[in-house]
């Protein structure tokens, strides 16, 4: 073999003849043959090969440490016969890389260092030929056990030093060291020895032993070693290294006495040592094939299972949806030429097809049945309020149950509350069942319809059902005649026909109706019945016998009285067929359609109105009644004369009324609100029109104002002529049919003025409520009416909080709140000022009649009243200051001004006499001259009889005298009762609470009405503050008259314009007159319509101040203190200011959404309160003046609580008809409730 000779590399430190020292080499350098020492460290040798080592015969020391050696070739060291020391520490040599012949030629080897390698086991065959080995270092490896074969078969009789430290040795065999008899030093430290037999007794030469840093377990198995160690350390020649570290592990409780191995004995050892031996074998790592396969199989199975589950769920949903769709098609679709019940079994490929689709997401698409020449659309418009009762649920359940049955001809289908109601009867085809015209003819606006079917007494209790159905106009002129001659199926179809045949019709949708913008262009397919006509008397008789046929209904639709589900808000969204597709289709299918001329369309509209009027549930005909009889008319009969029906005059029984007619006579007069799209002639308009809320009709045909004023009293009806507006008109529920409702007290209808009509054009959601006084009313009750609002559904939660939290709610307050409410059904009228049953909504301008009745009432009651009236009168003046100017700083800007503004302007428009205006603007609470004006208005009240007023006064005064002895006690407790009764009246809206709520309401009426009579608007003033604060925004002009707002509470926004100048004025009579004049001038500048209003108001205010001056002087004579006088003066002053504010915003009121019709009742109440102040006499005694202030402070003590409850509900805007204008209007003032001490201070101190 050639010897490779190379020069000494640069990395070699020493290159001599005997020694070669290199580092960081990747190979073994070719040293000279004479080299005795070869040291190569910190290199990168992966293996030891025979190259350049086989010829180093003289080599005695070979050091290859820290080179990363992993493999040693079998013959790499065979030429080193003279090698004595072999250093291979800090490498990666494993047990498998050493064979039995690796060290076989090293006969002279004495020191073998294999420290810090990867040795796991020891085999004695490695050292078979190394008999001269004296030092063996195996520390820092991974040796786990020493068995008998570890050194067995070796010839290491010369071995003196054995280092096995820092390994993983946990087991040592009993004869492991027997082949090594000459051992002198043994190091077994830093291992995992817990149990070890006595292996050191054969080693007689042992002088150094190290056993520390192990995990000794002091059991009885370790007792032999402990005994050896105790004997071993007795000799001074023996050394036990780190004997103090031979501690037992705290594994058992038995070692408490033997904490060290040296102290372990038979007495303190633990005999219950675990009897097992952990033997770690050197085996190659198994591939995780089975585990991976198992995991793969499990994962695949799980994925397949989840996929299958998802498919099953999807399939189930799909089938369920198809089943629902199929059910919808079966139930709502049929061809027009077949019986109604026969469509369930027919094939869908027969003549004609239906494309209706009724889903469960409250959505009804256009349901049209297209035959050879007929189509019928059924539409359901969006509705904000849909309260389902038990009848709808029962009908829906019966409808589904009847799916599988075919009961013959005569079944009826219509949609109600988001459900498709189905009614059948098994009568013969000749006996047609009348359809529920009250539901089908309801024009677009949701109505409270009571008892669509009159049930038998034992079956179902009266339920309230609210449904939203679109009434569409008929097209052919003879539909009205044929309507009741056709079967119920054709009846249902024709009642929902659209007014055009094959033309795109755009209903007049106004700008604020954003919800209908996507549906401006709508195409409707109309159809006409193909059934022959029957005589006219026949269909009228069918309508009369409609309720009777319902009792005999054999279909069992109403057998289940309990509702299965209750959906409070169930809106329906209509999806319409595109215009282009229908035009193409209709051109293809029906090219010979006849277009109706304009006279025919008008005639159709007239017939539709007549039909609607006949079938309406609450129609009341007053055309044949006298003027005095109209006020007490009964809504149980409807008489209508149709010119097209040969003047058939038949009494139609309202389907809503299910009780005997005798009970109807005792109930209060019902308010009928009829919504008809168009009346084409003046005669029908005079009969049917009462209130216009849409400019569409006004654009179509403008009726002269004189015609309206002359004919408007003919009928107490309300019209909503917009076809797709979200305006809802709610009729009054009768007390007999709804025992839980309160009775009504009604006022006669008033004329429609120019101002109100102008406001009606602007405000699309204005609604008029006409009430009338009833002679038979034992209690004064109010039934809440809902004002048609666009956003009322969003305001329902706020209303509920407001009504439940307000401690001083009264009837008038709830009246206003309930107009924007959805769910309120009634409220008590306990806090009616002066017990006047007729002081209720008064939207129309002509208020002379109402004022007269109120004045006459108050005048007669004045005679029997005690001093409490005078006390409360002072309280009312201050309360009017506080609530009108402080509690509600923006009260007069929008709402309260409606009354003053519209009345003032309307009286000017109608040329009402100055006496009425003086009565209207009388501001002094103690001006007796105004009382005469109230009596002068007797001439304006021709429809009210004195007997009615006296009868009601008599009842109320009798209960009033019973309450006079509880003056202050009743004053503090009655508002709480009002809150409880009102809350109960709202919370007990459910049908199961009818009786309880009725009893509570009656008790409340009998006790609270007389109390409020004697206390004169005490609760009324507090209740008016709630709606005003909640919805009225403060205009900038209100700051012109905050003079007396300092009297009790401070107005936060009152210091905008004129508070500085007015506060600087001293409080005397001249200053007050000057202030009123200034206010009048400012209002005169603001009013563009009428300058005479402001001047007249200034004159009236001066007259009032004169009366106050007289009263002040008279009070000084009686010796009353100054604070009482100033209190009264500020009361009159602030009352005048509040009244003036009503005029300041009159120009703004007409341009804003909230016209007087939106909140007619509150405006009337504000005006009536002023009349109460005008009517009350002026008491001269100083005692009464003092009592007034005392009563005022007592009442003011709980006003902060009321203020807090009002302030909590500031975010509620109850009538946001035009939300854009409401948001862009003046900023809302923030009210800060006064503290208790500030509220109870005297007016002088506060000022």
Swiss-Prot record:
Note the SUPFAM superfamilies from the entry: L domain-like
Residue numbers spanned by region Disordered: 828-866, 887-927, 1223-1247
Location (main, coarse): membrane
Membrane-crossing residues?
294-314
Xref: InterPro entries: Leu-rich_rpt, Leu-rich_rpt_typical-subtyp, LRR_dom_sf, LRR_TM_domain-containing
| Membrane topology field | Single-pass membrane protein
Q: Which PROSITE patterns match?
A: LRR
Q: What segments bear the compositional bias annotation Polar residues?
A: 898-927, 1238-1247
Which keywords appear in this protein's UniProt record, sorted alphabetically?
Leucine-rich repeat, Membrane, Repeat, Transmembrane, Transmembrane helix
Q: Which ranges carry the LRRCT domain?
A: 214-271
SMART domains per UniProt: LRR_TYP (SM00369)
Q: Which GO terms describe its cellular component?
A: plasma membrane
Where in the cell does this protein reside?
A: Membrane
| Record flagged with keyword Metal-binding | no
* Residue windows of the LRR repeats: 34-55, 58-79, 82-102, 108-129, 132-153, 158-179, 182-203
Q: What is this protein called?
A: Leucine-rich repeat-containing protein 53
Q: Which organism is it from?
A: Homo sapiens
């Amino acid at each position: 073999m050639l010897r490779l000779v190379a020069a000494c590399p640069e990395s070699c430190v020493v290159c001599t003849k005997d020694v070669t020292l290199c580092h960081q080499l990747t190979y073994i350098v070719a040293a000279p043959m004479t080299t005795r020492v070869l040291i190569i460290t910190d290199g990168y040798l992966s293996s030891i090969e025979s190259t350049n080592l086989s010829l180093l015969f003289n080599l005695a020391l070979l050091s290859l440490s820290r080179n990363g050696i992993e493999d040693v070739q079998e013959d790499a060291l065979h030429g080193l016969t003279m090698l004595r020391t072999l250093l291979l520490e800090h490498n990666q040599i494993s047990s498998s890389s050493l064979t039995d012949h690796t060290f076989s030629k090293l006969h002279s080897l004495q020191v073998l260092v294999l420290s810090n390698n990867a040795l796991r086991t020891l085999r004695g065959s490695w050292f078979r030929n190394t008999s001269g080995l004296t030092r063996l270092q195996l520390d820092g490896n991974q040796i786990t056990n020493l068995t008998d074969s570890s050194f067995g078969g070796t010839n290491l009789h010369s071995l003196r030093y054995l280092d096995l430290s820092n390994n993983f040795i946990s087991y040592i065999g009993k004869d492991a060291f027997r082949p090594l008899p000459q051992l002198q030093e043994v190091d077994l430290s830093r291992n995992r020895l817990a149990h070890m037999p006595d292996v050191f007794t054969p080693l007689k030469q042992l002088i150094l032993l190290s056993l520390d840093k192990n995990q000794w377990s002091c059991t009885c198995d370790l007792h032999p070693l402990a005994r050896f160690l105790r004997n071993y350390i007795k000799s001074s020649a023996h050394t036990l290294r780190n004997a103090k570290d031979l501690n037992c592990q705290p594994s058992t409780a038995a070692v408490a006495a033997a904490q060290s191995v040296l102290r372990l004995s038979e007495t303190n050892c633990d005999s219950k040592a675990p009897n097992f031996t952990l033997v770690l074998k050197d085996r190659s790592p198994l591939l995780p094939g089975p585990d991976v396969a198992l995991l793969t199989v499990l994962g695949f199975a799980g994925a397949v299972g989840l996929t299958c589950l998802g498919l099953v769920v999807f399939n189930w949903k799909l089938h369920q949806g198809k089943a629902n769709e199929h059910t919808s098609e079966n139930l709502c679709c049929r061809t027009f030429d077949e019986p109604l019940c026969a469509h369930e079994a027919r094939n869908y490929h027969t003549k004609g097809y239906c494309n209706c689709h009724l889903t469960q997401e409250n959505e009804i698409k256009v349901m049209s049945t297209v035959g050879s020449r007929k189509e019928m659309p059924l539409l359901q418009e969006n509705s904000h309020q849909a309260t389902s009762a038990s009848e709808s649920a029962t009908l829906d359940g019966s409808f589904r149950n009847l799916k599988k049955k075919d009961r013959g001809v005569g079944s009826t289908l219509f949609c109600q509350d988001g459900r498709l109601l189905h009614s059948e009867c098994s009568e013969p085809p000749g006996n047609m069942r009348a359809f529920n015209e009250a539901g089908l003819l309801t024009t677009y606006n949701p109505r409270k319809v009571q008892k669509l079917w009159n049930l038998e007494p034992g079956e179902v209790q009266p339920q309230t059902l609210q449904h939203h159905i679109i009434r569409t106009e008929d097209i052919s002129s003879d539909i009205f005649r044929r309507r009741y001659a056709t079967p119920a199926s054709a009846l249902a179809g024709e009642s929902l026909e659209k007014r055009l045949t094959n033309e795109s019709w755009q209903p007049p949708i106004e700008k604020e109706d954003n919800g209908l913008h996507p549906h401006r262009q709508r195409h409707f397919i109309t159809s006409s019945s193909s059934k022959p006509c029957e005589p006219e008397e026949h269909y009228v008789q069918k309508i009369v016998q409609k309720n009777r046929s319902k009792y005999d209904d054999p279909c069992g639709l109403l057998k289940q009285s309990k509702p299965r589900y209750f959906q409070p808000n169930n809106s329906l969204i209509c999806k319409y067929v595109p215009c282009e597709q229908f035009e193409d289709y209709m051109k293809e299918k029906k090219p010979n359609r006849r277009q109706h001329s304009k006279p025919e369309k008008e005639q159709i509209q007239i017939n539709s109105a007549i039909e609607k009027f006949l079938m309406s549930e609450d129609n009341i005909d007053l055309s044949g009644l006298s003027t005095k009889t109209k006020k007490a008319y009964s809504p149980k009969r409807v008489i209508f004369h149709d010119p097209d029906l040969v003047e058939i005059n038949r009494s139609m029984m309202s389907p809503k009324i299910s009780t005997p007619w005798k009970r109807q006579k005792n109930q209060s007069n019902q308010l009928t609100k009829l919504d008809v799209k168009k009346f084409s002639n003046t005669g029908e308009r005079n009969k049917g029109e009462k209130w216009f809320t849409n400019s569409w009709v006004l654009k179509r045909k403008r009726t002269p104002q004189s015609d309206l004023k002359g004919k408007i009293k003919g009928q107490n009806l309300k019209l909503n002529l917009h076809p797709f507006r979200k305006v809802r008109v709610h009729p009054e529920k009768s007390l007999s049919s709804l025992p839980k409702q309160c009775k009504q007290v009604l006022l006669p209808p008033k004329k429609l003025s120019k101002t109100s009509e102008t406001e009606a054009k602007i405000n699309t959601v204005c609604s008029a409520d006409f009430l009338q006084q009833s002679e038979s009313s034992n209690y004064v009750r109010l039934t809440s009416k809902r004002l048609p609002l666009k956003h009322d559904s969003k305001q329902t939660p706020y209303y509920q909080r407001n009504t439940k939290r307000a401690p001083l709610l009264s009837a008038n307050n709830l009246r206003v709140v309930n107009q924007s409410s959805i769910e309120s059904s009634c409220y008590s009228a306990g806090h009616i000022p002066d017990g006047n049953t007729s002081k209720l909504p008064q939207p129309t301008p002509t208020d002379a009649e109402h004022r007269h009745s109120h004045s006459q009432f108050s005048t007669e009651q004045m005679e029997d009243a005690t001093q409490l009236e005078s006390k409360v009168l002072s309280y009312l003046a201050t309360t009017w200051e506080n609530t009108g100017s402080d509690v509600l700083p923006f009260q007069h800007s929008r709402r309260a001004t409606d009354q003053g503004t519209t009345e003032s302007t309307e009286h000017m428009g109608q040329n009402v006499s100055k006496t009425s205006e003086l009565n209207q603007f009388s501001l002094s609470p103690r001006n007796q001259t105004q009382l005469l004006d109230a009596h002068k208005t007797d001439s304006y009240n021709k429809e009210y009889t004195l007997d009615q007023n006296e009868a009601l006064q008599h009842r109320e005064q009798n209960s009033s005298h019973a309450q006079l002895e509880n003056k202050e006690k009743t004053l503090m407790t009655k508002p709480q009762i009002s809150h409880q009764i009102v809350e109960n009246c709202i919370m007990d809206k459910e049908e199961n609470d009818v009786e309880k709520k009725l009893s509570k309401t009656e008790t409340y009426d009998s006790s609270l009405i007389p109390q409020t009579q004697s206390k004169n608007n005490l609760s009324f003033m507090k209740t008016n503050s709630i709606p005003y604060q909640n919805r009225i925004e403060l205009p900038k002009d209100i700051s012109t008259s905050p003079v007396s707002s300092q009297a009790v509470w401070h107005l936060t926004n009152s210091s905008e314009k004129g508070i500085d100048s007015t506060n600087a004025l001293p409080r005397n009579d001249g200053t007050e007159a000057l202030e009123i004049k200034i206010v009048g001038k400012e209002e005169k500048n603001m009013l563009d319509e009428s300058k005479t209003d402001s001047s007249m108001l200034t004159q009236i205010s001066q007259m009032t101040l004169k009366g106050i001056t007289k009263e002040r002087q008279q009070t000084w004579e009686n010796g009353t203190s100054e604070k009482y006088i100033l209190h009264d003066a500020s009361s009159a002053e602030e009352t005048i200011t509040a009244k003036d504010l009503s005029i300041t915003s009159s120009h703004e009121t007409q341009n804003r959404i909230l016209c007087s019709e939106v909140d007619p009742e509150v405006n009337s109440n504000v005006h009536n309160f002023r009349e109460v102040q005008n009517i009350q006499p002026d008491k001269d005694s100083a005692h009464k003046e003092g009592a007034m202030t005392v009563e005022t402070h007592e009442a003011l003590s709980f006003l902060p609580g009321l203020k807090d409850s009002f302030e909590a509900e500031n975010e509620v805007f109850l009538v946001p008809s035009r939300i854009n204008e409401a948001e862009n209007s003046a900023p809302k003032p923030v009210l800060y409730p006064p503290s208790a001490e500030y509220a109870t201070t005297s007016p002088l101190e506060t000022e």
